[in-house]
From Swiss-Prot:
SUPFAM superfamilies referenced in this protein's UniProt entry, alphabetically: RmlC-like cupins (SSF51182)
Glycosylation site residues: 75
Binding site for Mn(2+): 108, 110, 115, 154
Function: May play a role in plant defense. Probably has no oxalate oxidase activity even if the active site is conserved.
Intracellular or extracellular location(s): Secreted, Extracellular space, Apoplast
Disulfide bond entries: 27-45
Alphabetized GO MF terms: manganese ion binding
Name of the gene encoding the protein in the UniProt record: GLP7
Organism: Arabidopsis thaliana (Mouse-ear cress)
InterPro entries, A to Z: Cupin_1, Germin, Germin_Mn-BS, RmlC-like_jellyroll, RmlC_Cupin_sf
Family from the record: Belongs to the germin family.
Coiled-coil stretches: none
Complex and partners: Oligomer (believed to be a pentamer but probably hexamer).
Name of the molecule in the record: Germin-like protein subfamily 1 member 1
Length: 217
């Protein structure tokens, strides 16, 4: 009986994916409309006969992002079905990461996707920590690539305090999700109980208030 249950679970887990396999060539996301027809599984798709080449291309990642007004001196530009309609159901996301001097993508997770990053300009310190607490870090120079396993805490940091840096990432889900550890812990809505944060991080109530104020800007 136990063997049968384990075999069943193994088979089921092998079928679990962040994004389901598409059942057609493409499912271009249409502009919002109250008269939209449904072509697949309850999901909105443009009539395939109306799809055009512009649905499958975008210049969204060609424009540099402004890092000076952004928290952590980092600007992330992401492809979505709004700027790349043909992205719908293909199970991918692309992101442009512009770093200011000492810019950082703080420790965060993508619960539904693995990520591969290519450094295009500057030098980045990148890394992740596995579930045993082991840390893997590497300096990335232009043209070098690093992969972050799905669901693990990871970061990217521009080691130059003055010059900018640039990277492009690909993620294995149309909706990878992002949780920045510090923000999720200290400025969630509604907030965590102060007692929970005090115990979890071995800090006092004043520390909690100070950290929250700092993260909220």
């Amino acid at each position: 009986m136990i063997l049968n249950i384990l075999l069943t679970l193994t088979l089921l887990m092998g079928r679990v994916k962040s994004d389901p396999d598409p059942l057609q060539d493409y499912c271009v996301s249409p502009p919002p409309s109250s008269h939209q027809q449904i072509f697949l599984n309850g999901k909105l798709c443009k009539d395939p006969t109306q799809a055009s080449v512009s649905d499958f291309s975008t210049s969204a990642l060609s424009r540099p992002g402004n890092t000076k007004t952004k928290p952590f001196m980092i600007n992330v530009t992401v492809t979505t079905t709004a700027n790349l309609p043909g992205l719908n159901t293909v199970g991918l996301t692309m992101a442009r990461l512009d770093f200011g001097g000492s810019g950082v993508v703080p420790p965060h997770v993508h619960p539904r996707a693995s990520e591969v990053t290519v450094c295009l300009d500057g030098v980045l310190l990148v890394g992740f920590v596995d579930t045993s607490g082991r840390v893997f870090t590497q300096e990335l120079h232009p043209g070098e690539t690093f992969v972050f396993p799905k669901g693990l805490i990871h970061f990217l940091y521009n080691i130059d305090t003055v010059s900018s840096a640039l990277a492009v990432s690909g993620l294995s889900s149309q909706n990878p999700g992002t949780q920045i550890v510090s923000l999720s812990s200290f400025i969630s809505k509604p907030p965590f109980l102060v007692e929970v944060l005090k115990s979890a991080y071995d800090i006092n109530g004043q520390d909690v208030a100070r950290i929250r104020k700092s993260l909220e800007g």
